């Protein structure tokens, strides 16, 4: 059975948790245009294949797809534009230092509303190898079987 999204969650990157080991998370605000937030509230955002990057001392979210707003007419946004993330300078420096290490990247894990503002949960992640992914799937299956047996027993 599929998990239900929490009320504030607008989009989730479940593939990231499969492809990466998430070592640290941080919450960031995101600069959006009017038609973008309207489209996001409708559930038209996709975090798959997106990543965050430090450029000129600022953090940007790249490759996040937000579908055009249907009623947006000529003022509609570009679906794949880079979007600026709102973080403190020390947080940007810390994340930049962590991603300079080989194998680390910053991936968005969740897009949600908090007090009416759109936020992104970023994860500092290290890529998994294929054998790590297989091992994780085996462990998950064993855990599920044990839980099923325990439920049947009691």
Curated annotation (Swiss-Prot):
Presence of the UniProt keyword Cytoplasm in the record: yes
SUPFAM superfamilies assigned: Small protein B (SmpB)
Single GO BP term: trans-translation
Coiled coil: none
Record key words, sorted: Cytoplasm, RNA-binding
Location(s) in or outside the cell: Cytoplasm
A Gene Ontology cellular-component term: cytosol
Gene Ontology molecular functions: RNA binding
Primary localization: cytoplasm
Pfam families assigned to the protein according to its UniProt record, in alphabetical order: SmpB (PF01668)
Family designation: Belongs to the SmpB family.
PANTHER family from the UniProt entry: SSRA-BINDING PROTEIN, TMRNA-BINDING COMPONENT OF TRANS-TRANSLATION TAGGING COMPLEX
Main function: Required for rescue of stalled ribosomes mediated by trans-translation. Binds to transfer-messenger RNA (tmRNA), required for stable association of tmRNA with ribosomes. tmRNA and SmpB together mimic tRNA shape, replacing the anticodon stem-loop with SmpB. tmRNA is encoded by the ssrA gene; the 2 termini fold to resemble tRNA(Ala) and it encodes a 'tag peptide', a short internal open reading frame. During trans-translation Ala-aminoacylated tmRNA acts like a tRNA, entering the A-site of stalled ribosomes, displacing the stalled mRNA.
Name of the protein: SsrA-binding protein
Organism: Staphylococcus aureus (strain NCTC 8325 / PS 47)
